[in-house]
């Protein structure tokens, strides 16, 4: 057991070249923990608030020096001498110090960086891995990756409305094999796109961002790449979508400019049901807008028995919004983004709330990432069985896959790859 003696913060860059917060926490024993926080492009209106400086003379107003200052003054003063392993008390102290419902005063970026760095320092103090410290002795499930190999929406400069087209190597025997399968398909997709005259530039999350105009185009290319790489769509590899529908929801309608469609909620549900009937799509994230609760109920009634319906902007990793969804029977899965809620303990509460209600949980990165691989450990710690951490390019994405490979290697025969156990059955 060791007390916090010092907290140091700094402004670093994320994968988009924007400033973010990194924090070092030092304990009396000399143990240290470091954490850097991500940021999102398509952010939910109900997320905890990132504090930005607003000084247009630095980083176009996106600087985080105010958040850094809050860490090194108010937060340090509140936590200095606190027991590092009392994570809930530490997180609650920062929440109380902030005094707002969405962490807007101190900044969720400041609070989260400290929260995660404290956990890492505590793990270092005990000389155990972070996944073991957070998850205990039964933390051993390696997650199925949702690999974002075609980017659209807010993550790419192309006409595709849907934000992410992902593959899941459910048929692989191990996590390391799943990463290999994904890499092989990604390489094949690059060849196919290039041969068809499309660019192979990558988007924020490392997937390709070709000038395709429809979901059918993207899914068609992915299907052919899976087959050409020697795998069977729907058996070895399943598909997942992140529609990020809030981004094209206007005045009660879903305006899909790339598709040339304007749909009401029922029309959007029918559109998604048609895609799921024609392709091996087993998971759809944010298929409807964050406050279209009635539409979500229809989507859940239509597809919820056979398709994982993931709430991201809908739930924003917030236990209260999740409980509302559970009570209403809306969605059946929670996307877990630590910076949406802003502390480790609240993140774990959200995962526990989901799992107790029979909802699945998917650990997730953000589009603006760093080399910090904490979410890989958290995916194993929570045994959630699924992770979204981008494509098979960009070191900010592959850092998480590499950490999962290390964890699987360390767990040895105790490791269990989730594989097909994540699939819903009618």
Curated annotation (Swiss-Prot):
Cellular localization per UniProt: Cytoplasm; Secreted; Cell surface
UniProt: (2R)-2-phosphoglycerate binding residues: 163, 337, 366-367, 388
One GO CC annotation: cell surface
Keyword Magnesium: yes
Keyword Secreted: yes
Pathway as given in its UniProt record: Carbohydrate degradation; glycolysis; pyruvate from D-glyceraldehyde 3-phosphate: step 4/5
UniProt-listed Gene3D superfamilies: Enolase-like C-terminal domain (3.20.20.120), Enolase-like, N-terminal domain (3.30.390.10)
Required cofactor(s): Mg(2+)
Residues that bind Mg(2+): 242, 285, 312
InterPro entries: Enolase, Enolase-like_C_sf, Enolase-like_N, Enolase_C, Enolase_CS, Enolase_N
Top enzyme class: lyase
UniProt record, GO biological process: glycolytic process
Active site positions, chain numbering: 205, 337
Record note on cofactor: Binds a second Mg(2+) ion via substrate during catalysis.
E.C. code: 4.2.1.11
GO molecular function, one term: phosphopyruvate hydratase activity
UniProt similarity note: Belongs to the enolase family.
Biological role: Catalyzes the reversible conversion of 2-phosphoglycerate (2-PG) into phosphoenolpyruvate (PEP). It is essential for the degradation of carbohydrates via glycolysis.
Name of this protein: Enolase
Species in which this protein is naturally found: Gluconacetobacter diazotrophicus (strain ATCC 49037 / DSM 5601 / CCUG 37298 / CIP 103539 / LMG 7603 / PAl5)
Lineage: Bacteria, Pseudomonadati, Pseudomonadota, Alphaproteobacteria, Acetobacterales
The encoding gene: eno
């Amino acid at each position: 057991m060791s007390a916090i003696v010092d907290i140091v913060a700094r402004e670093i860059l994320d994968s988009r070249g924007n400033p973010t917060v990194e924090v070092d926490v030092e304990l009396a024993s000399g143990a240290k923990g470091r954490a850097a926080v991500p940021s999102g492009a398509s952010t939910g209106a109900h997320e905890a608030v990132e504090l930005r400086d607003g000084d247009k003379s630095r980083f176009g107003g996106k600087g985080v020096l105010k958040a850094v200052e809050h860490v090194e003054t108010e937060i340090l003063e509140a936590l200095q001498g606190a027991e590092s392993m009392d994570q809930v008390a530490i997180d609650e102290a920062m929440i109380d110090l902030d005094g707002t419902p969405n962490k807007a005063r101190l900044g969720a970026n400041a609070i989260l960086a400290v929260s995660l760095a404290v956990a890492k320092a505590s793990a270092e103090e005990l000389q155990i891995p972070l996944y073991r410290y957070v998850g205990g002795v039964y933390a051993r499930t390696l997650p199925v990756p949702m690999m974002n190999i075609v980017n659209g929406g807010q993550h790419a400069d192309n006409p595709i409305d849907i934000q992410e087209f992902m593959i899941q190597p459910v048929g692989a025997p191990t996590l390391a094999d799943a990463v290999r399968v994904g890499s092989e398909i990604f390489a094949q997709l690059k060849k196919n796109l290039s041969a068809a005259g499309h660019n192979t530039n990558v988007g924020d999350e490392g997937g390709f961002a070709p000038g395709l105009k429809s979901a059918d185009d993207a899914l068609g290319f992915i299907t052919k790449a899976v087959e050409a790489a020697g795998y069977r769509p729907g058996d070895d590899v399943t598909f997942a979508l992140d529609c990020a529908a809030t981004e094209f929801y206007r005045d009660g309608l879903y305006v899909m400019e790339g598709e040339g469609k304007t749909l009401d909620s029922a029309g959007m549900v029918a559109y998604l049901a048609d895609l799921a009937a024609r392709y091996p799509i087993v998971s759809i994230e944010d298929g409807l807008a964050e406050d279209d609760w009635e539409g979500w109920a229809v989507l859940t009634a239509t597809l919820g028995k056979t398709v994982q319906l993931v709430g991201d902007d809908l739930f924003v990793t917030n236990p209260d919004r999740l409980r509302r969804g559970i009570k209403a029977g809306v969605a059946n899965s929670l996307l877990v983004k630590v910076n949406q809620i802003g502390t480790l303990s609240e993140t774990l509460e959200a995962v526990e709330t989901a799992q107790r209600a029979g909802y699945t949980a998917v650990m997730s990165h953000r589009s603006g990432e760093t080399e910090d691989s904490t979410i890989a450990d958290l995916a194993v710690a929570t045994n959630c069985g699924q992770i979204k951490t981008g494509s098979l390019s960009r070191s900010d994405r592959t850092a998480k896959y590499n950490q999962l490979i290390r964890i699987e290697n360390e767990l040895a025969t105790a490791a269990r790859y989730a594989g097909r156990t994540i699939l819903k059955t009618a």
